[in-house]
Amino acid sequence: MLRLSESEHWNINAHFQDFPDEDHFSIPHLATYAGMKFFYSFYKFEEMIDYYHPTYSDRSDIVERIRTHYQLISEKMGYEVKPMQSYINTWAYGLSHFERPDLAIQLFDYNIELYPHHSSVYNAKGYFLLNTGKEQEALKLFYQSLSIKEEEGIRKVIEEIELSRN
């Protein structure tokens, strides 16, 4: 008898996992979870940790690596998948805490490139610049944000900046 795995036509992307301590009633959720983890193993962006580690301080290709990763995801899924705004902002703020403002700025700019019609991407970069003492650049971004969506909180931030400058 020929085993499927020995067939010349074997090209099925499959994985077998035994659950010896489970029974008919406990296995469905565990097996479904394991299957989803297997089929979407390509989704996780594990390379991000490289940029937080001091030995990788010379790395500056963060946007290109993220772009390449999400192109791979898009190809596998069959439609365009973009990183969420919140992910990019979280990575950017994380990098700023690790004293990598150069990379943080790249990520904020990438977020603006991906989501140019979302006010929140301008706010995120604006707050970052404000916290690094670049008030004039921050003001431009806050005004850009308001041109997309009026927000009372951002209007107050602008007023405070302008009052402090006088």
Q: What are these model-derived regions, one by one?
A:
Residues 89-90, 120-124, 155-158:
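Alpha-solenoid helical repeat scaffolds
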Residues 2-63, 78:
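C-terminal catalytic histidine-bearing segment of alpha/beta-hydrolase fold enzymes
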Residues 116, 149-150:
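Short coil turns that delineate tetratricopeptide repeat
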